[in-house]
Amino acid sequence: MESKLQIISGKYRGRKLALPPSARPTQNRARIALFNMLESGIIENTDKMVVWDAFAGSDAFGIECISRYNATAIFTDVAPESIATIRKNIAAISAENNAKIVQADAIGVIQQFARGANLVFVDAPYDTAEIGRAFVNKLGRTADSGTILVWEQESNNAVEPNTDTWEVLRDKTYGRAHFLILQKI
């Protein structure tokens, strides 16, 4: 079956992305809405942006940022098949110089990647909401002030962030996907 997931804007617009077998990628329409929100005053300086796609899976968020912005993306995932797919997708667009790919548990490498990342995307497995919460809480203790966090959750299983650490900029639901866009206080 051919992937319907594609890069939606920027220099690689229209390119299809390979998917790992177990992926649950954010649908194109939801990603379009997400980037419209980000580009409506949340992200202002995209020059030399560092993006961390923490539970990368299909890598669609990080690759979209590479395509749209002058960005370097860090991709982390524990699944070997996801890492192999990320490498394949990055090679297909010849973006190796804009990508760092690490097979690791995202929570375990927060100290390594949180500082310096301007934009962090977390889309932990939908059936494990507590993993997403644990990541966001630990990231809140480490990330630089002003860091933007996009937290995707299952809409019927969404949990709230710690508002002592994060300011809620947007809170939107698109089908099963619930997006919280947060800024580190």
Report the location of each language-model feature:
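Conserved SAM-binding motif I beta-strand of class I
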Residues: T72-D77
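S-adenosylmethionine
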Residues: F113-G175
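Conserved hydrophobic residues forming the short capping helix/wall of the S-adenosyl-L-methionine
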Residues: L38, I90, S94
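Conserved H-loop
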Residues: A95-E96, I107, S145
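S-adenosyl-L-methionine
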Residues: M1-I63, S67-R68
